[in-house]
């Protein structure tokens, strides 16, 4: 859950030095130290933490298992459990990868590549803003950092409840993204697109039917956000799918950014058809690296009248 902060994002407040924030400062310093550890140690820590989370976070574990069971019916129960455990591993690896992107970005040198950059370059050459249709990848800001080595990305964000944590994350992300735009600030999003920005936008979570429609996601009806239609229509921007993922030996990983051609006729006159198309794009992306997505979120929590509960 997030909320608006009563001060400009990223701004330091003297109140952050009060004792109630000391635990967060200590935690941040500890995380900064983790970022300078060799990847071999980070990799082992990630596996250990993933195993611990698997045991302790029962609700997240059940949600992950249920989601994978629904979305990959071709998997056996044993495969579902194995892949669910890997989701937790990839999430922990993503934490270390994000710390590296924030505090030790040189670690990524020589480890990344991009395919399809011309789709963004051509759109911007025509004066178009670009809405990058992505996902909530477990790579987190590591993916954003890799994108920033090839073009200037903006990002949509949700403010954190804790004001100190919000400031620290905002400042770390400021080293990666050109602009960070509150997900509720439609005017700024539209303005940035009109100015020719390339905004990473992830329409892959359940925010209810006030902000979307029911559309199949891996064959399961899911509340699907439709705000991108308004953004594209008003700004005259184009929608371009973007996906990034880790591959190869996890002990010496490589990273790839995959950019696809412009989604034609988006938005169309049919809201549900657009939602279906976006979900199909996301499905295709997730099949590349199925465990590098946040399956522990309740993607199917909203059930319209007549639909059975999932969880």
Q: What annotation goes with each model-predicted range?
A:
Residues 29, 63, 118, 142, ...:
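Short Gly/charged-rich anion-binding patches and loops
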Residues 126-184, 209-212:
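Catalytic core of membrane glycerolipid acyltransferases/transacylases, capturing the structured
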Residues 2-11, 47, 82-85, 124, ...:
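Non-catalytic C-terminal accessory region of glycerolipid acyltransferases
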